[in-house]
Amino acid sequence: KGKGLPPGAEEEMVAAGVPDWYIGSCKKIKYLFPKAHAVAYCMMAFRIAWFKVYHPLAFYAAYFYRRSQKGGFDAGLMTGGLESILANIDAIDNNADATAKDEDLLTTLEVVYEFYLRGFEFAPISVYESHATKFLIKDGKILPPFVAISGLGESAAWDLMEGRKGKNFLSIEEVSLACPKVSKTHMQMLKDAGAFGSLPDTSQV
């Protein structure tokens, strides 16, 4: 909100030949958006659009990373395919009691829907290949990070990356032993997400 002009300022501006539109603006708004700022916004929008067209996987990987930092990317919801995404979008659109969190989730769902429509796919989360926090590009697909699993925080995600170094696990049990910060609940989340592939629960024969 503008705070107007201090006493005498308008008279001084008129005397100095300042245009009426500028004086009027000073009375109404606190900040005048400069042309250079507007140009910078346009250039940034052009860069983003260029990446979206010519390097789409890099664009989506960066976008999903930013959304995940705010808890706006849930791998359980986002990696289920086109029909699943559309069903979740419809559920929020038709919910008269949708919360601000739901609306924020809807934004991500719509971009993921576009992602699928363009023929792209997510690679399954992998205990060996997923990053703790970054979305990676792998074999023409996007590989979600560990934190994309709802309820699995950064501490556990980084512990997974550290614990797997130089390892060739024989079982899910071995993963658990190598990653002490990853709780049993987290391990079940990873298992449900398919992160362990064909690893058996234990190393016992």
Locations of the language-model features?
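Noncatalytic, beta-rich nucleic-acid-contacting surfaces in large DNA/RNA-processing enzymes
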Residues: K1-V205
